[in-house]
Amino acid sequence: MCVWREEQMGFYGRWILPQVIQLTMRQKNFAPFQEHTAGAAHGRVLEIGIGSGLNLASYHPDIETVCGVDPSAELLAKARDRVANVGFPVRLLEASSEKLPLENRSFDTIVMTFTLCSIPDPDTALLEIRRVLKPEGELLFAEHGRAPDSDVMHWQDRITPIWKRIGGGCHLNRKVDVLIQAAGFRLERLSAGYQKFAPRPFSFF
């Protein structure tokens, strides 16, 4: 899910971009990443960038609760339509991930799927995520980011300034693993590679 600043909320940002995001995230190529990530959550769950709530169907029915945060009122309205179809409590908050209105150490699992690429200040957001995560909690994520090959990196760097303007702030070239570790997290499991369904600058997941 993409996250963008209020100043990006012109007609395109408020009405067209949410539809584009929802249609993109509903593509079958993204489903395995979303299902695997959300399906591993447990206990009290916080989803950063819940968007239209597509991940709600992938959570295990035995989880305690899901709190979903997103800055887009338009996408959250779509998420509310999906809440009735799940068997666990869901709380939806219109808020920035850089300033979470949540208590310290209050979640067992935090989930992000295709969100960190578009958070305006990912360093601050990750520190906030660490603040609200319990000491033994888990951060589960599926993200796209900077490729390891220099020729692909070159194109990611060239495309990103334009892409982020039309893609809700999405950066193709963020070093996701570096950002997460810089916030104090320890990476226990990480798999990454190029996906076949999109050009390489867009598909290093």
Regions found by a protein language model. Name each.
Residues T24-R44, L54, S58:
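Conserved alpha-helix/loop element of class I SAM-dependent methyltransferases that forms part
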